[in-house]
Amino acid sequence: MKIQTPDNQWLQYLQDAYHQLLSAAPFPFSKLTPSTIPAVSGVYVITAKLDGKHVPYYVGRSKNLRQRLYKNHLMGPLTNARLKKYLIKSGECGSLHEAKEFIKACCWARWIGEPDIRVRGAIEGYVTGMLFPKYGIYEEH
């Protein structure tokens, strides 16, 4: 039995969103404040600038980018900040403090707004598949 698939316009939409996200201006976590991030829903990618290159570390989506990027990823505890948890679990950082300092010193965020929850999920999945970030893929429920 053949599965019904979306038309080519949908694939083009995902590709356009991917390129829009990658071409968004990267913003360093070291200069991140709540007012620098819009309080809108969207998809984001966190990269670590290592040896002059932006290495994809994490792709995510949120109903509130300001909350997710600033309050959770940068300022939040391990329960809300998956990237910090992954940095510690992998041994890249030795503690919560060290993970936060790594994010502030090395990480950058890019984001695009997207109001529709299903579309956000599709964009997140597409971007994750294309960038294959260092963290965030291996957990299954």
Regions found by a protein language model. Give the residues of each.
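Mixed-charge intrinsically disordered linker/loop segments at interdomain junctions
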Residues: G129-Y138
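GIY-YIG nuclease catalytic motif and its immediate N-terminal context
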Residues: M1-K63, Q67-K71, H97-E98, W111-R118, ...
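Conserved short hydrophobic interaction patches
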Residues: N72-M75, M130
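Acidic, metal/cofactor-coordinating or nucleic-acid-engaging core segments within structured domains
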Residues: L74-W108
